[in-house]
Regions:
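Acidic, Ser/Thr/Pro
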Residues: 1-196
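Glycine/proline-enriched, intrinsically flexible loops and inter-domain linkers
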Residues: 185-272
């Protein structure tokens, strides 16, 4: 159980390991109603395959109420199209009685009186999926490496459930299921929104940074985009593109160019 404002960090300890996650509105559960993450509602609202740190960062329930917000994501490769793995999916491939994430969910949620399901909707963290040119749903080895993680912030009091995927018959876990670690931080801890990037496949990830001007620009807009490892304003409130364009032509403007990663010095001594 997690309180509103607390943080939920799901960590891939050894790399290339999927983890299924879902959360429930705790207050609604006490009233006998089951409101959990709805991947279809979420994709429709954020306009992406899954939320990422930034503007389109929240997972919603079927009532379009936010349940968690993605604060940090070191890998950026997940899935919201497939269900948590099921007993049937293994039986169809000849593996009868195989442990699976949907049954794990049922077991973990039993004490809350939540209805059991043969196939659970879930946020399939680290699962590397896609749809190819023949409209076939594909799955390959995860991109995640040891220590990669996703950090969420609870938007309500929640009941959370997580299952390290036990799939050992496909590349989903590199054919070798390993441990997932879930850590909870109290609201008093502060985490900035960050996306992890690697310069190449062998590099450690680097998280998006706030520029030296962020404390001022963030008071003028919440519309930030990631640019070369920095959060940069995309637009400012109460103006719009035409007003900003006119200001560039006719007035003096100040721009945060930190993402260019260079200094510009002007004035009489600039060439010395």
């Amino acid at each position: 159980e997690v309180k509103k404002g607390d943080y939920i960090q799901v960590i891939d300890l050894y790399g290339r390991q999927c983890s299924d996650l879902n959360v429930f509105d705790s207050e609604a559960l006490q009233k006998g109603k089951e409101y959990s993450i709805d991947p279809t509602a979420t994709r429709s609202l954020v306009g992406n395959s899954y939320p990422m740190p930034g503007l389109a960062s929240k997972f919603f329930d079927r009532n379009q109420d936010p349940l968690v917000e993605v604060m940090q994501d070191s890998i950026g490769r997940h899935d919201t199209f497939g269900t948590a793995c099921t007993l049937k999916s293994y039986e169809d491939q000849g593996y009868f009685g195989h442990v699976n994430c949907s049954d794990n969910f049922n077991f973990a949620l039993d004490s809350y009186g939540i209805e059991k399901r043969k196939a659970w909707q879930a946020v399939n963290l680290f699962w590397n999926t896609g749809i190819d040119t023949s409209n076939v749903f594909t799955s390959d080895m995860p991109w995640s490496r040891a220590g990669d993680y996703v950090l969420f912030q609870a938007q309500k009091d929640l009941v959370c459930v997580s299952s390290g995927c036990p799939d050992n018959i496909s590349p989903a876990n590199d054919w070798n299921p390993t441990d997932i670690f879930v850590r909870i931080y109290a609201e008093k801890n502060k985490f900035s929104k960050s996306i992890g990037y690697r310069k190449n496949a062998d590099s450690d990830f680097m998280l998006t940074k706030e520029t030296g001007f962020h404390s001022r620009t963030s008071k003028l807009t919440k519309d930030m985009i990631e640019s070369s490892g920095f959060w940069i304003p995309s637009k400012f409130n109460n103006y719009g593109s035409i007003a900003e364009y006119s200001a560039c032509r006719e007035n003096v403007i100040v721009m945060d160019l930190s993402s260019l990663k260079k200094f510009e010095i002007t004035g009489p001594d600039a060439e010395e």
